[in-house]
Curated annotation (Swiss-Prot):
Compartments it resides in: Mitochondrion
InterPro entries reported for this sequence: GCS_T (IPR006223), GCST_C (IPR013977), GCV_T_N (IPR006222), GcvT/YgfZ/DmdA (IPR028896), GcvT/YgfZ_C (IPR029043), TrmE/GcvT_dom1 (IPR027266)
UniProt-recorded name of the protein: Aminomethyltransferase, mitochondrial
Catalytic reaction annotation: N(6)-[(R)-S(8)-aminomethyldihydrolipoyl]-L-lysyl-[protein] + (6S)-5,6,7,8-tetrahydrofolate = N(6)-[(R)-dihydrolipoyl]-L-lysyl-[protein] + (6R)-5,10-methylene-5,6,7,8-tetrahydrofolate + NH4(+)
Assembly behavior: The glycine cleavage system is composed of four proteins: P, T, L and H.
Protein's gene: GDCST
GO BP annotation list: glycine catabolic process
Length: 407
């Protein structure tokens, strides 16, 4: 799904629980001087953050806790992430909904104001340009967040189509929130911790809901969502107030919510069975192949009207040739691009994400296999560094999700 762990995800999971971060830095960007810094950079360093290059930014991969410890603490208590490298933007105007529906597969018109959904931006061939959480603030205002590694191409794509749409008389404009920072508060203590900092009754705010409210004295965009499988929030806050808000959240949790880096964020999303763009989804993978058919609204399936609709709707009707699956495996953790074979040793697919699960204490992964071999329990083999190991297809999520929903 989200978080923009675009170039880094493979490296993070490869070193889960280890201390060598130099290789990660080398994989991404050569010069520290070229990297952008979020407004929380000094705060990260002061709190022991181990900074690494990621998608053009200097970001914390972990703090004093190990990645495994941070993963487990998020599941048991809570985590606070700086995800300000991601790009928040608004589309406004009386035609912003029909405009966005040309670019994404979601039934945006069908969303109630103050609610949102995961969606996918598609290209003319039905492939995924990016995934994004979109929110209908009002009928003429859409708020969305796109991945850091996809920012430039996403904005160029939106701008290109917006110009053509406006040239035909469409009423839509946009604003990119470079003046705001984005924090993600995740875990079972997220709601009770944040409640200390706002008068808004968060118990009435459910998974996918959106509010513009005062938090710790700042006007914030609050979405009950996340990238961990846990209950939680993403908080868009004016950048000048971001450090104070981070400090207040940690203080109100009495030390139970901890600062957490991109390393644990990756293991958490993998345990939750969430896609990492650049690994589990790319421009040649459709939402149907990625197991995201549920994100294509019923009306959109009937009417189409989005880029690549002919390809995607045919796959829904006939079935895709390949499918994303969850994987268990023996031996060392499977890595991106590891070959998947059937029991006869024939190639049937490829691993896209893999690592050791801190919560399950076993190897987990995701990948694509030929349709017909995607059913849970299917035995297979995974080739890692020239050696073959036993594996099997399994259901996802690996760890049950705990999204806050009405009883």
């Amino acid at each position: 799904m989200r978080g923009g762990l675009w170039q880094l995800g493979q490296s993070i999971t490869r070193r889960l629980g280890q201390s060598d971060k130099k290789t990660i830095a080398r994989r991404c960007y050569a010069s520290e001087a070229d990297l952008k810094k979020t407004v929380l950079y000094d705060f990260h360093v002061a709190n022991g953050g181990k900074m690494v290059p990621f998608a053009g930014w200097s970001m914390p991969i972990q703090y004093k806790d190990s990645i495994m410890e941070s993963t487990i603490n998020c599941r048991e208590n809570g985590s606070l992430f700086d995800v300000s490298h991601m790009c928040g933007l608004s589309l406004k105007g009386k035609d912003c909904v029909p405009f966005l529906e040309k670019l994404v597969v979601a039934d945006v018109a069908g969303l109630r104001p103050g609610t949102g959904s995961l969606t996918v931006f598609t290209n003319e061939k039905g492939g995924a340009i990016d995934d994004s959480v979109i929110t209908k603030v009002t009928d003429d205002h859409i708020y969305l967040v796109v991945n850091a590694g996809c920012r430039d191409k996403d904005l160029a794509h939106i701008e290109e189509h917006m110009k053509a749409f406006k040239a035909k008389g469409g009423d839509v404009s946009w604003h990119i929130y470079d003046e705001r920072s984005l924090l993600a508060l995740q875990g079972p203590l997220a709601g009770s911790t944040l409640q200390h900092l706002t008068k808004e009754d968060l118990s009435k705010m459910y998974f996918g809901d959106f509010r513009i409210i005062d938090i710790n004295g700042s006007k914030c965009f609050l979405t009950r969502t996340g990238y961990t499988g846990e209950d939680g929030f993403e908080i868009s806050v004016p950048s000048e107030n971001a450090v104070d808000l981070a400090k207040a959240i940690l203080e109100k949790s009495e030390g139970k919510v901890r600062l957490t880096g991109l390393g644990a964020r990756d293991s958490l999303r993998l345990e939750a069975g969430l896609c990492l763009y650049g690994n589990d989804m790319e421009q040649h993978i459709t939402p149907v192949e990625a197991g995201l058919t549920w994100a294509i609204g019923k009306r959109r399936r009937a009417e189409g009207g989005f880029l690549g609709a002919d390809v995607i709707l045919k796959q829904i009707a006939d079935g895709p040739a390949i499918r994303r699956v969850g994987l268990f495996s023996t031996g060392p953790p499977a890595r991106s691009h590891s070959e998947i074979q059937n029991e006869k040793g024939e190639n049937i697919g490829e691993v896209t994400s893999g690592g050791f699960s801190p919560c399950l204490k076993k190897n987990i992964g995701m990948g694509y296999v030929k349709s017909g071999l995607h059913k849970p329990g299917t035995k297979l083999k995974i080739v890692i560094r020239g050696k073959t190991y036993e594996g099997s297809v399994t259901k996802m999520p690996f760890v049950p999700t705990k999204y806050y929903k009405p009883a």
